[in-house]
């Protein structure tokens, strides 16, 4: 029987452009529950190209989600020619030793911004870009937990039943003895996505990440 690859490039997700109704929904948590389906969420232009080409090549079904706000707010160098970025592998977006900020998609730039602010206060945050949220790269997650012992997980979606909860569960089951403090979580609230100016109050901000990181670092 002939085998065919299937990559579903879904509509953009995420808030930040004040779009109406359900354009801003982050539904990666729902997609991640589908057995055998990969869910890929790039955070920068170079990865967007490499991960998309890798998704097309992959024999498993892949759902490829692109952050709407990053379309308009982020620029970056993209290598010419054909290349792929490995699926199922997280990336270290910034090295650090005091705390790990685990993010993906549109929250990675926020995590990097927060890490810059934290560095001014003497806190060296490591930023992990998951890139593929289903399946999770457990090895990379474990490596950063063992390195820093403190973790904050960030997602744009609502708090309940999301990727952040999955990451926290995996850490609690596999690496709890490496933790020096309870895991922190920064998410959107459990409510309907707003639109227009109301987005400003709903959205996750770098300041929220900074505050949560300080709470985790100061835990005694």
Regions found by a protein language model. Give the residues of each.
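General beta-strand structural signal in soluble alpha/beta enzymes
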Residues: 9-11, 39-43, 63-66, 127-128, ...
């Amino acid at each position: 029987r002939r085998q065919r690859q299937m990559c579903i490039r879904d509509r953009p997700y995420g808030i930040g452009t004040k779009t109406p109704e359900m354009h801003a929904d982050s539904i990666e948590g729902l997609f991640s529950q589908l057995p055998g389906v990969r869910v890929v969420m790039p955070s920068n232009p170079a990865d967007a190209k490499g991960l998309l080409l890798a998704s097309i090549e992959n024999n498993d079904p892949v759902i490829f989600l692109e952050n709407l706000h990053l379309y308009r707010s982020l620029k970056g160098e993209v290598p010419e020619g054909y290349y792929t970025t490995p699926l199922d592998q997280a990336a270290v977006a910034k090295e650090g030793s005091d705390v790990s900020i685990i993010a993906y998609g549109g929250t990675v730039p926020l995590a990097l911004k927060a890490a810059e602010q934290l560095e001014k206060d003497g806190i060296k945050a490591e930023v992990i870009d998951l890139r593929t949220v289903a399946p999770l790269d457990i090895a990379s997650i474990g490596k950063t937990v063992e390195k820093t012992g403190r973790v904050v997980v960030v997602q744009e979606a609502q708090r309940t039943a999301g990727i952040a909860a999955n990451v926290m569960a995996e850490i609690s089951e596999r690496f709890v003895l490496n933790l020096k403090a309870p895991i922190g979580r920064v998410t959107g609230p459990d409510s309907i996505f707003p639109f227009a100016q109301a987005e400003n109050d709903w959205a996750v901000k770098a300041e929220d990440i900074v505050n949560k990181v300080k709470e985790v670092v100061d835990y005694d």
